A protein has these predicted regions:
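Non-catalytic substrate/cofactor recognition surfaces at enzyme active-site rims
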Residues: 1-598
Length: 598
């Protein structure tokens, strides 16, 4: 494990400051900076993967982004896997440095690691000009599957996972939150600008380019993970074990300490969302006149929420000081609006203990849970667990139930507190029940069986997205034909963007899960070889239907040429699947005109 200092900031510092000063003084930062990594090594194949846990939200991309994205966590995982593939699954130890993995630059695809020609010649330009757009053509389903899987031929056996932790109040927008109209910092307590939450946005390190912010935060996590991977020396030894149970969080009795030092039994509540939930966060502001830090509410929105379900006196008192906007735990039509039955789980791999929680714990909430479980493990064992036991919190696991704050943070009613579903004692309930799991694990006992199980609501799901009726092209045009091609006799320098638009069809006809909608191919002798696909950071696939009532649609492929791309002749290729009004889905492909890369 090691600290990563520049990939997350606290987006609700006023809530964090409501925690006891004595508790806050134990920690240097108001977010967790530690990344914990597990390196997996096979006796035969060597390193085959890594899992790491680090707390930062996957919100580098804004809510206006319309492209499918794994955000900074997904980017980090891809960078790590490309790096491992490029380095031949390195077995060396010692700290990685910038020379090992390109500093802040992205790792190269394996397919690009070949000797580079010294320069682009006129002959190469002439060669590129001889390859025109292929025109669209139909492919048999079996052929497209085989063809697309061939584009993945360089996939490594290495798998890297960048797991979430107690990220509830942690933002990757590390430059801070500013008003978009004045460029001044947002109000500290309410994250508003002249009373409006809609104007307050967090800024990532690549501001104003959200793609660059995503790349930078992903790359910072990758660099730290690569460093920990290369320096990993502590071997996990001991038992592999777990404990798992389901609990009804809408009515748990919890024993908590009182201000006089005694104990008091309290209860959790049916789920409810507070007014500040609708205010959103600096990573994605809400709308209307909502604001964070609202522990009063207002009559108009109480009336609106009450039309759906007016909370009773007991629920209001249980959730206090949260003013209830949506009484989701008591709204049952057409099915439950919020979960009540949740899973909790402890997994042990030697001296590593993973706490699987079904929500987003804030920084201090996660710290309290980790410490409570570790204390039980150490005090209840005969040295099997000790100060060297690593306890990590795996957030958003097994199911999702919004946020979990400390009791003190809950009083402030920032977004995270308003989204803590089961009332002010939610964290205490988690701590109490995880301590029971830890006690059972130490004693080598099973968890008492219960009849509590989450409801199966698969047959109640409502789908509002209409199916694809048909796809079509203009007369004389085929699926896969180029609508807007790369300019003739083009050559591009690294860092430039090349794009081509194709007549296409709805991607929902076939998600091409094992394949790709987009390829960049390079000429190698007489053959075109795939070098980048739509999972690569440099290549984007954008589908659009200019008229909602038209069956015609287009796919634009945008390739920003990486700095380490091999000079040569390239082209863009699109894959898709079209649906006729009558008949079966047909797969198609088409290519752009060739172009040269210097």
């Amino acid at each position: 494990s090691g600290d990563l200092l520049d990939a997350g900031v606290n987006r609700s510092p006023s809530g964090y400051l409501n925690n006891p000063a004595e508790e806050r003084s134990k920690y240097r930062y108001n977010v967790d900076k530690e990344m914990t990594l597990v390196k997996f090594v096979d006796d035969e194949f060597g390193p085959v993967g890594s899992f790491n846990w680090f707390a930062t939200h996957g919100t580098s991309m804004s809510r206006t982004n319309s492209l499918i994205s794994g955000d900074n966590k997904g980017a980090a995982a891809r960078f790590m896997e490309d790096w491992a593939e490029q380095n031949g699954l390195p077995k060396q130890t010692g700290h990685a440095n910038s020379d090992d993995f390109g500093s802040l630059h992205l790792p190269r695809r394996v397919s690009t690691i070949i000797p580079e020609p010294d320069e682009i010649t006129d002959d190469l330009m002439q060669l590129a000009s001889s390859y025109k757009a292929s025109g669209g053509r139909i492919l048999a389903s079996s052929n497209i599957t085989r063809r697309i899987r061939n584009t993945q031929k360089n996939n490594a056996k290495f798998v890297s996972a960048f797991c979430q932790s107690n990220c509830g109040d942690v933002s990757p927008n590390v430059l801070g939150a500013f008003c978009i109209d004045t460029n001044l910092p947002c109000d500290f307590n309410h994250s508003t600008c002249n009373g409006k939450n809609e104007l307050c946005y967090g800024r990532g390190p690549g501001y104003p380019n959200e793609f660059e912010s995503t790349r930078i935060i992903g790359n910072r996590q990758f660099l730290k993970a690569a460093d920990l991977f290369n320096s990993a020396s502590e071997e996990l030894q001991g038992k592999v074990d777990y404990r798992h149970t389901y609990l009804d969080f809408s009515q748990l009795e919890v024993s908590v300490s009182t201000s006089t030092g005694g104990q008091q039994v309290v209860k959790t509540c049916p789920a409810a969302m507070g007014f500040s939930f609708a205010a959103g966060t600096t990573d994605g502001p809400g709308a209307f006149d909502f604001k964070q830090g609202d522990d009063k509410g207002n009559p108009f929105w109480r009336l609106v929420g009450g039309i759906l379900k007016k909370p009773g006196k007991e629920q209001v008192e249980c959730q206090a000081p949260k003013p209830i906007l949506l009484d989701t735990g008591e709204m049952k039509e057409p099915y439950d609006w919020a979960p009540a039955i949740l899973p909790i789980q402890i997994i042990r791999i030697g001296q590593l203990v993973i706490l699987s929680v079904p929500g987003e714990f804030t920084t201090m909430a996660g710290r309290r849970l980790r410490d409570a479980v570790k204390n039980v493990l150490i005090s209840g064992s005969n040295g099997e667990f000790n100060s060297n036991t690593h306890v990590v919190l795996a957030g958003l696991t097994n199911t999702y139930s919004q946020y979990v704050t400390t009791f003190e943070e809950y009083q402030v009613q920032r977004y995270e507190g308003a989204s803590t579903l089961y009332g002010p004692h939610t964290l205490s309930a988690y701590i109490q029940e995880f301590q029971k799991l830890a006690t059972a694990m130490v004693a080598n006992k099973e968890i008492p069986a219960t009849n509590i199980l989450p409801p199966d609501m698969l047959d109640k799901q409502i789908g509002l997205l209409p199916g694809v009726i048909l796809d079509s092209t203009p007369p004389g045009v085929h699926f896969g034909d180029v609508s807007s091609d790369v300019a003739a006799n083009s050559d591009f320098r690294k860092g430039s963007t090349v794009n081509a638009t194709f007549h296409s069809a709805c991607p929902r006809n076939d998600l091409l899960t094992d394949g790709t909608f987009a390829l960049v191919e390079r000429l190698n002798g007489d053959n075109w070889i795939p070098v980048y696909d739509d999972d690569d950071w440099s290549l984007r696939f954008k589908w659009s239907r200019p008229s909602k009532l038209s069956p015609e649609s287009f796919a634009t492929l945008e390739w920003t040429i990486p700095e380490d791309a091999v000079p040569g002749v390239y082209r863009l290729r699109h894959f898709g699947a079209s649906k006729p009004l009558i008949g079966s889905i047909e797969h198609f492909t088409g290519t752009s005109r060739a172009f040269a890369v210097r």
